[in-house]
Every structure is written in structure tokens, then in C-alpha cells.
Amino acid sequence: MATSEETAAGYVIGVYFHSVHVHCRIIVWQVNFLPLDPNDGETECYFVVDTLTKEAMERMPEIQECVPSITEHARDLAIWELALRLQNQTIVKAVRTASLPVVLIMTVGRIVNDVIPCPNVRTPRPLACAYLHCEATVTFEVPLTGPAASTGTWHSSIYRECAISAIEICLKTSRGIYSCQSNEAPEAKREKRGLDISDVFVCLTYDIPIAGRVLSLLVPHAPAFHVLWINEDSKWNGAAVEFFRALHHKLFSERNGIPPLWLYVFPGAVEEGTAFAPLLPAFPCIPLRYGSPTSLDRASVQWDLFEPHILTHFDGIKRTSLADTVFGYDSLAISRECEDQYVWPTPVTDININLCTDSDTMAIVREPSGLVAVNLEALLRTDSVLSRVSSIVSLDTLLDLSTPECRRSVELRYNSLLSTVLSWSTSRGHKWAAIVKWKLFFLVQALEPEQWSPEFKDLKRACQMAGFTLKGGTSGDLVFSSHANLLFSTSMGYFLHAGSPRSTAGTGGEPNPRHITGPDTEGNGEHRNSPNLCGFVTWLQSLTTCIERALNMPPDTSWLQLIEEVIPLYFHRRRQTSFWLIPLSHCEGIPVCPPLPFDCLAPRLFIVTKSGPMCYRAGFSLPVDVNYLFYLEQTLKAVRQVSPQEHNPQDAKEMTLQLEAWTRLLSLF
């Protein structure tokens, strides 16, 4: 007897692990679906059901044995479920057609049997969004001292010793605002005006016929929105976990039926830290996005039905074919020709020794030159082997967490691309200047964009023949600029690149350094030839500008004079945290414990304090013990490499005294 079918047209907006039914060997996923009809505004709910094999049942971890923590709960179960999810053909079809509207083919019981893409339908489908802001106080029970773990991070130790309190929740929807605080008295909570949590989330029950019986599945539903934005700090402060735990209890604890599972993995569970978002593969069964809310249209934005990337850090997925699948790596055979091109480490940092003079760690070009900067990572992502790798996965991460076969593929394509561009530049009479991981710099004779245009077209053809699509323009994979002087250096322990712009017409051919006349920090005078106080937003940018100035100055120019020009800028920005943040590679000394466990988030940036480098976040007030002297000494060191001069001990003493005086100035509140 034929089973009657139903259909629904629209967009899949999420697939969630609902439950496992051991007695009938069934796993159930919840499918959130948005109908094409804009008048049908609420999320619809359907289900994908699969039968578990004996082997899958034997491998299934017991969730009862998992003890929830601030950072994770039932991680092994999430890893087990992910392997099954990636094998289910209905879910695989939904993932492959995620950018398109689809038609779901279902049984009467809302069980999805097939997913049919509709490529010719492009109806705009705006998504309703809500915003959840979670704050909490994180306190250490024991002060943490000593060196960080082998990973260079402190968050694991902090989470073991900390307490989460004073949780504040604010959830803003189109229908109003829900808010609560963990330390509020019950009377205050009742009297507070605004939405109740039951106005935001409700519980729906679906009776699903499965394996000859009817299962009552409980599902969370948000009538007012499709997507929930959450503030960035919720990734590490523990408040979101507590909110969703309480919400799960509120919705399902007194209802008959099977609720969705409650499991999660937050960045704090990753020993070395991660750039990937938290994973909540089951409850709250709604698309989660982190950061400042923006409007979303399902028909026009790139959409992932689930983002389990954080699991690739853990055994069971790390460096396995499952990790490759999660990343979107498409394995293809690599030709024998590519193997012959494997010469460069991936990625590599190097300076053309033929451009170096006194040291093989620094090259200075003191003649007008065109400079072409090629974004190798962007170009590699146009290659057929790597084009399907998720945009949220950097190639550095791919090299670290993927299979040896995937890593080998990246290395071969990296070498193939480098060989292509370097061979082309040599054949055209150009010189490569430096390679810094995923960026290549080379010098060209063209000084104007019009002169470079024919060369670009020829390079584009060469890349295309090698399997790479060079776009240029606003795509960011290639940038042309023209300079009077250039510097490339690794002498400070990290790569520095600076170039002074060429003079423009009417300037008599003199260099045109990037500086303007501007007011002082109090607005009551002028500092002639001082850098624009609004011109840079980070200390590293000011460092580059100091080098540019040094390249343009006579050899006998005082180093202190060059630094003095940026002191007004430093004073203006002295209490601005984001200005002083730098990578750990630019720091000196052993990192010290941060005040909060946000070093679980990558990439990590640091403030150099008098105790040592400290991982820090731009949104927090500057530490009181910033080591401004370190930043001034690094600026001096950068300038000195451009114009080395002989100085007597008296000059050295004068420089020390002046740097200390500027340090006292910057330390003023």
C-alpha cells in the first residue's frame, strides 16, 4: 500500500539533533524550515529519522555519565552524532542545496524522505532576528600564578577555579524585551515590566509515527523570530550556558513527551583555544549567530545548516576524514607535476636575499618601484581542490586539524601557486621581494596603475593556466601600489613591511610622506609634520609610519626626532585598549594570566604589561600597568634598523632618559 506524501516549499534554516530512542534503534533530527510564502512567517518543524546500526549503538556514549561544566556537556555524544549526521543522505542533500530553496518530500507524520532543490526560484526571504545579551561575573577562587600550560593559554586553569555569578540576561525581540538577573529577588522579578520567557519561547508537541509506535516529541518554538544573535562575550563568560540550561528546564520539565537533548561545546573546552563558534547541536534548536545583529535574508546570504567545526579540535574527529568533511575539503587526485613543485614549506616567510645588503633579514629598496601584493590564501581558494573549504576555516587551521592527505594537497597547491607567480615575475623582468605566509610581494617596473594593467592581464592568464582565478580589483587577492622607498624586514623577530608613497604631480619630485599638520592633544597648538592623529587605529600602524618617515629622512636624522612625531598620537590613544593590542609574536617575555578566560578565543591579542604580555580584549578597560616603555623601545628599534648610526654612550643615556620621560607622560590618566 502506497504511503501518502506531503510537500513543503521553502528554505531549510537548521538541522538539530533531537533525540535517540534506544528501544527502537532510532535517531531523530529536527529540521527548521521557512516557507516561501512571506505571509507564513513562523518557523515550521519537520523531522529526519534514521535507523541505528548495531555498531552505532555500541559506540554511543552514555549521556547520563556526562557531568555538565561551564564549557562543555556530552561532547563525546556530539562527536558520535556528527558522524551519523554526515552519513544521512537526506541531511547531506539539505546541506548541498543549502543556498537554494527546496521542496521537502514528507510522510504525513512530518518525516522528511527527500529534499529537492528549486534552483530557478529566488524569492527574497527576510529572516526575523532577536538579540540575546548575556553578562556574568567570573571570579577566581585561587589566584593563578606561574607559566601558562603547554598550549600557552590559561583558560582551562581559570575555568577549573572560577565561579560564575551575577548573571544578567536581556533578550530583545520584535514583540518586546525579556530581562532577568540571577541575584534579583522573586518579588522584583514578578513586578518587572516586559515580556515573560513564556512570551518568547513556547513548547510544541508533535506525535510522530516511528517504528510502529507514536512518539511525542517536544520542540522549542520562538514565534517572533527565526535567528538568535548572541553577544561575543557569551562565548567565554558562562552566562549563555546557564540561560539555556534554565530555559530547557522551564520548557520541558513538567511536560509529557521526549524533549530535545541538551549538549554543548564552548571554546573554553579547547585546550589551545579556537576561532570557531560554540556548538549547540541540539537544544535550543534555533540558528545562533554571534556578534552585533545585522539583517539577514535567507535567499541572499551564505548559510550553514550547522557549524560543528569546534569538534575538529578533539580526538575522534581531529585529523580524520570527518574533519575534512566538516571543513568542506573536496579530495581530488593531485597530478605528478605538482609533486615536482614541492619546494617551499607551507606557509613560508622569506625575504629575497638578492635585495638584502647588510643583513639577510632586511631589504631596503631606495628607488621608485611598483609593488604588487598577492593574497595567496584568496587565490588558493579559487582552486578546484580547495574551493569548497568553508570560508570560516583558515588555511592555517586546515593544515593543523585536517588529514595528512588534505595537508599534502594544500602544500602542493601552495607550491604550485608560488612557482606560477614567481616564474611569471622572473620571465617579465620583475623581482620578488618577500613572502610572508599567505602573502607574496614582488617589485615591478610599472609606477602607475595604467602601466601595470597589461602586466596584470598577463599574470591573470598565467594563474588561470595553473588552475587559479585571479580577480584583482576589490576582491582583495591582488593590490598594486607605487612607492619611493620600501622596507621588508624580519630582524625584529616578526615581519615588517613599510613603504613611503611616491611624490605626486606638482611636488617637484620630493617624497610625499604620509603626514599632515594637526592640532596637539589638547587642541591648543600645532605639531608641524606630525602624523595625523586620526590616521591610525593601532600601534602597529604607527610603527609602520615611523619606518616610512625614516626611509624619507636624511641618514643623520635623530631617531628621537622621528619618535617624537608620534608621541601626540600615543598620548591621544594612551587609554584606548584596541590601540595597544598586538600578536604574541611581537611581544617579549613570558605571558601572564589574563583577568578573565577569554584567551580561549582565537586569534589572541596581547597587551604588554610590566609583568609580561597579557591576553586581552578590545572591549575592556586598559590594565593599569601597561608597559609603555616596551612600545617606545620597539618603535626605536624599528627606526634604528632603517638608519643605523654610530652613537656614543652619552647619546644612549640621553635616549634612555627621553624614553622614560615619554613613558611617564603616557602613564598619566
Swiss-Prot record:
Record key words, sorted: DNA replication, Host nucleus
Subcellular location field: Host nucleus
GO cellular component, one term: host cell nucleus
Protein family per UniProt: Belongs to the herpesviridae HEPA family.
Name of protein: DNA helicase/primase complex-associated protein
Isomerase among keywords: no
Species of origin: Human herpesvirus 8 type P (isolate GK18) (HHV-8)
Keyword NAD: no
Disordered, as annotated region: 502-526
Assembly mode: Associates with the primase and the helicase to form the helicase-primase complex. Interacts with the origin-binding protein. Interacts with the polymerase catalytic subunit.
Physiological role: Component of the helicase/primase complex. Unwinds the DNA at the replication forks and generates single-stranded DNA for both leading and lagging strand synthesis. The primase synthesizes short RNA primers on the lagging strand that the polymerase presumably elongates using dNTPs. The primase-associated factor has no known catalytic activity in the complex and may serve to facilitate the formation of the replisome by directly interacting with the origin-binding protein and the polymerase.
Domain of life: Viruses
TM stretches of this protein: none
GO BP of this protein: bidirectional double-stranded viral DNA replication; DNA replication
